[in-house]
Amino acid sequence: MNKTLMAAGLAVVLGACNSSKKSDGVDTSAVNPFFTEYTTPFGVPPFEQIKVEHYKPAFLKGMEEQTAEVEAIVNNPDKATFENTIVALDRSGELLMKVAYAFSGQASVNTNDEIQALEQELSPLLSKHSDDISLNPKLFARVKSVYENQAKLNLDKEQKKLLEETYKGFVRGGANLDADEQAELRKLNEQISMLELTFGQNSLKETNAFQLVVDKKEDLSGLPETLIAAAAATAKDWMESGFSHCIIRV
């Protein structure tokens, strides 16, 4: 559950001056890096291979796969258990998280107009996908059954924590609301996701537009020479004399 909700928060701005590079427009979906295993150290996304056009099909496929995984849990004829319900749900959405982590990173620190437009397009889809899981009555019934019978399950501390957080995620996500209240909650969640995204993008634009121009090197006394050199290079790029700084958000 937490992984799914995380996917809806892609617009959080982690920082830095953005890039204005655009994709080359070539359809490379046949070699989409998200559809293969990473061969990078520690599973770091191979950003040098990832194009903007790779994200949307990977997100759509990721949501499709997780929906199928959730349906398999819901339609399991066996009695709900910790393994076939809680663990299965926690392990669902692997592809969705794979692309979400990469996209949120790029959208935060190396964004452009294409990526921001894609954020606007994906945000309501991800909000709906999250709600479709959180507000699935049959899925919640299975989770609730495991939660209410946990005393019989001999769970360790980690398992108990996962069960508790999963159950609370559903309750806080509106699983106990009636149909009308859930419909209203869906609308609010979509509005909130779009407002958060728009705020983040506007904040990033303001950050990127900021310039602090220092005319005299002595005013930078005490700063490392590497930082002073970087400021001079930034000023040169921006056609300014002296030393210029942008805001780095972390």
PLM-predicted stretches and their roles:
Residues 7-15:
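Bacterial N-terminal signal peptides
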Residues 1-6:
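Bacterial N-terminal signal peptides that target proteins for export
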